[in-house]
């Protein structure tokens, strides 16, 4: 089975941001996506409206950038679409926010979007699909050829805990504290074609694996492989999908800058004849769990002998190491915002601080998430 790979400009960028539609009175999720997207289409036309689309549930809208040359261009693109959606949503008494899970809303009461693809998913996966009331951020970074896509995907696996710890924003599920920094990552990983990617050596092996999955009836198309990192042949990108939903544009930009810089550096290393390392899958699995459980306080394994290091310290060093790349890509400020997240705390920390101050009232957490979306910056607990 041959899978064409659409070559794209190296280090070009695209971002997908899954937003929650929240009733401003009850603070619960509200299924208004079809109405809001229809109004957006009528207001700005099909081309611009294509930057916002349905997801599995009617209480979700995904905002998508075009192909961008820089992180600044991508976040400005997102901001423009979010502004249009916010105006339309607020007329209906609906607010926009983002976190890996809604703190209180129950998946059991959510309407599934009327779409054959989603109907098939629910029919096949049943309860696993019906509870996918989760929200993420996906970052696409362009690569020129499939020969680079697989080595870069494999090498990026070592950074899965870093991205998850930075973005972790789902401590609450159905009104209770899960004890995790990211419950979303654990919910999503329950799907048989989600979770960690398999370290396939090259593009022919990827093609062969996809052919096997289709022949076995596991998937109908390769779009149904939802790995934490995956190649996207249609876009000519490596797509990082591990991140929880990020509440602010500042955090979206920081994560996008980190992804762009890492892929750009790996692309350069391949051009110079360097063979990118592929981490052992068990080690990545353990580190992913540690990041999901402890967030930025995780101690991640750094070798196969049990050596560990703080993911926080690793991120500080990584930002410093990547700054020359970031300056060249014009995303040094956004990369430095990784350090802002380390200082203010990732969203799971901020949410818990709000809940503690409010004696466990999670509607106050929702209010803070709505505020963060509106201001574009983290609200620091005082």
Swiss-Prot record:
Catalytic function, reaction form: L-cysteine + L-glutamate + ATP = gamma-L-glutamyl-L-cysteine + ADP + phosphate + H(+)
Biological process per Gene Ontology, one example term: modified amino acid biosynthetic process
Coiled coil start-end: none
Lineage, opening ranks: Bacteria, Bacillati, Actinomycetota, Actinomycetes, Frankiales
Keywords: ATP-binding, Ligase, Nucleotide-binding
Protein name: Putative glutamate--cysteine ligase 2-1
NCBIfam families, A to Z: gshA_cyan_rel (TIGR02050), PRK13517.1-2 (NF010042), PRK13517.1-3 (NF010043), PRK13517.1-4 (NF010044)
InterPro entries the record matches: GCL_type2/YbdK_subfam (IPR050141), GCS2 (IPR006336), Gln_synth/guanido_kin_cat_dom (IPR014746), YbdK (IPR011793)
EC number: 6.3.2.2
Keyword S-adenosyl-L-methionine listed: no
Broad EC category: ligase
Function statement: ATP-dependent carboxylate-amine ligase which exhibits weak glutamate--cysteine ligase activity.
Protein family according to the UniProt entry: Belongs to the glutamate--cysteine ligase type 2 family. YbdK subfamily.
Gene Ontology terms for molecular function: ATP binding; glutamate-cysteine ligase activity
